[in-house]
Amino acid sequence: MDVENRECSADLAEELRKLSASRSLSEEVGVDPALVSEGAPEGVIEGPAVVSSPAKMYTALKAVDDEMPPLKSENKAVVETEKVESKPRGFSAIDFAEEDGDSDADAEDEDDEDDEDDDEDDDDEDDKDMVTAKALAELANASGKKSSMGAAGPSLPSLPQRPAVRKTAAATALDTAGRITQRPNGAPSTQLTATTEENANSDTAEGNETREKLQNIRVKFLRLAHRLGQSPQNVVVAQVLYRLGLAESLRGGNTSNRAGAFSFDRANALAEEQEAANQEEELDFACTILVLGKTGVGKSATINSIFDDRKSVTSAFKPSTNKVQEIVGTVHGIKVRVIDTPGLLPSVADQQHNERIMGQVKKHIKKASPDIVLYFDRLDMQSRDFGDLPLLKTITDLFGAAVWFNAIVVLTHASSAPPDGPNGVPLSYEMFVAQRSHVVQQTIRQAAGDMRLMNPVSLVENHPACRTNRNGQRVLPNGQIWKPQLLLLCFASKILAEANSLLKLQETATPGRPFGQRSRVPPLPFLLSSLLQSRAQLKLPDEQLDESDESDDDEEEEDSEADDYDELPPFRPLSKEELEELTKEQRQDYMDELADRERLFQKKQYREEMRRRKEMKKRQAQMSKEELAQPDEADDEAGQPAAVPVPMPDMALPPSFDSDNPTHRYRYLETANQWLVRPVLETHGWDHDAGYDGFNVEKMFVVKNKIPASISGQVTKDKKESQVNFEAAASLKHGEGKVTLTGFDVQTIGKDLAYTLRAETRFNNFKRNKTTAGVTATYLNDTIAAGVKLEDRILIGKRVKMVVNGGVLTGKGDKAFGGSLEATLRGKEYPLSRTLSTLGLSVMDWHGDLAIGGNLQSQFMVGKTMMVGRANLNNRGSGQVSIRASSSEQLQMVLIGIVPILRSLINCRFGFGGGQSSQ
């Protein structure tokens, strides 16, 4: 019995101890069970035992937080062990906003976002330590301390207050930086912390100043809208406010939507307060408007309607504005300056009149640049053929394309009745306005050269019989009051321009020029190929008889050889009757003998020509020395006969032609004039009757009797594009075997012109070796590409010639490397036999992409038929093989042309080839 009593006493004492502990805990945190049960969601708190432990108390607070309205930050209330913070962050922001509505809520939200990561990292450790004896002891020690409800007051009666003071943004940043920069020995880094604090303070000060200025712009614009009778819910007002908020977020970083809403609410409240206190005062705002448009569309009448006064003379029968004038007035306490201009004429013949007027306007606006441009046209003026395009292009040429970036299209006579549609039924007013607006906007896009332009359109009606509302304001057929809407568009453009200059959002961007219109990288591979191309040196007229590079090295061998043709026995050619009497074998022997004699005779003529050239060269060298010894002696050319013009041969006809070929139209004479002008034939051009789509000009001359020079140019033009090619070159000798060639080229690359300045010097290393070094510079698309090249030419014996070159070209930080090797093998009797084989190899590296190509070409005679074979292949597996044969005797080769004809017929009949592929 005693044992049972002792057990009951122990149980009772245990229950009393638990009850005492639970009551002390409730008193410690200041929680009224009834209030908790009343304020918490249903089913979460049932009695005082629910908060009998810290873990359960955290659960209860978290459940209550989850039921509260969610915020963007989505912060959850956390009860920590060392700092008992029981006030939810989400509600603190809402309560402060409801009481004062100032920037404290925004600052607190930013603090919460800064503390969010730290709180979430500590949640797991706090949950584990809550149930420990240490946590219970700390809560017991703090049982006598109670927190006040603070600013939240009656809004949260069921939740305890956090006794600890919130961390500021700077303190949170310092705390975070201190933890991140912890050293291995446990000592924090104070240098980085101080730097972070200094940068944060400077950025915050600058950002606050910018926000304050932008807030003043918001207030100013809301006051303007209020003066014009427009609410913040107006489409234009809402769009401008949205753009201001977007610009602020782009300039100063991302901000929450709630902060933007608070800024708008404060600006709206401040604007209403200022307007209520000072309704009659003039605003610190002025707008300058430039008026442009055709004559008779109602520019001056609209100005009078804006000021509600006869500021400008109007006439319905003749132009009333004869000069540029400035009209200044006040509309609803807003200073408005309008630059009225004389009317423009749409005809192409009157463009000089328009240029004179716009020249006067340009001089006038130099004093005060306009904020907005109003381009006037009539709504009832039907035009679908871009008849106003010349006028708009004239405006664009004189003022620049930027004149349309801040332009508003004003359509007068807006009360006109809509015309009939295609079905005979009158169009709706909205469709009528949309069609007319689209035509004017499209014409402006064409004139400005920017198809992205979308100029706003405002409707205007100045007729005295226009319908009005109770306040006497003119109303359009669609129910719109046009005057405040037009002024609101003008003021909105000025406000956005002020915000743009404040936030400096367009330092690198230019309207109408997407992405700053970056200069494109020049085509380096194409320019490098042009640089590596070998060019022949220019020669004086008396040097044209000089031997070629190949024959110059064979002088001794040619002199030592005897003429085999002189040693042949006499030969009598047979007549046609005598040939018919010969047998087939005799006729073949006769033909072989005749071919050998013809070959030896050509060889003899070639050697005689070489000897004659060498003698001429020696005489010219001797004459040059005599001229240097007697510089005053002049040549007497008066006794020479005048050159007689002779007709030049006609252009070669294409392989396929008809009677419409206009070769006879462009016959010309070769005269003594050094200028040679010829037409350029395009066999595959668009014009069948006149295939000459360009002309070519050439001239050779000598500068100071020492420097040979040449000028050549070609211009071609078809329906789609035009091409210009110009080349000027000159050679300068400076020593034996040293020649410098300079040139200037202009050529069309795409839609741009490329200007190239080049120079190369060739000098003889040895008797059979010549080296060339050159530089070049090309200007294209505001970019300069410069490069160098090195070339070496060597002769091996009489039949082999090798040319090796390499170069590099750089431009706009980009580089291209390339080189080529060419080996030529000539026949034994070249150039008489015309047997020649060439092997080429080219390499180019651009952007790490290695391109390797090889080509082989060979030509030889088979009887009297010339055979030419070509083959090329690159490292990407693509290549080409071609064989060509030309003969004047084997006419049966024409039958080969039947093969492609038959192939085309088979493809058309059975559907083979033709680029079709089966799926």
Swiss-Prot record:
Its cofactor is Mg(2+). Its main location: plastid. GTP binds at residues 296-301, 413, 461-462. This is Translocase of chloroplast 101, chloroplastic. GTPase involved in protein precursor import into chloroplasts. Seems to recognize chloroplast-destined precursor proteins and regulate their presentation to the translocation channel through GTP hydrolysis. Probably specialized in the import of nuclear encoded non-photosynthetic preproteins from the cytoplasm to the chloroplast. SUPFAM superfamilies: P-loop containing nucleoside triphosphate hydrolases. Residues 641-650 have a biased composition (Low complexity). Residues 461-463 are annotated as: G5. Residues 340-343 are annotated as: G3. The keyword Transcription does not apply. Residues 284-513 form the AIG1-type G domain. Residues 319-323 are annotated as: G2. It comes from Physcomitrium patens (Spreading-leaved earth moss). GO terms for cellular component: chloroplast outer membrane. GO terms for molecular function: GTP binding; GTPase activity; metal ion binding. Residues 20-47, 64-211, 540-585, 611-650 are annotated as: Disordered. Residues 293-300 are annotated as: G1. InterPro entries: G_AIG1, GIMA/IAN/Toc, P-loop_NTPase, TOC159_MAD, Toc86_159. Residues 96-128, 543-567, 629-638 have a biased composition (Acidic residues). NCBIfam families: 3a0901s04IAP86 (TIGR00993). Residues 73-88, 574-585 have a biased composition (Basic and acidic residues).
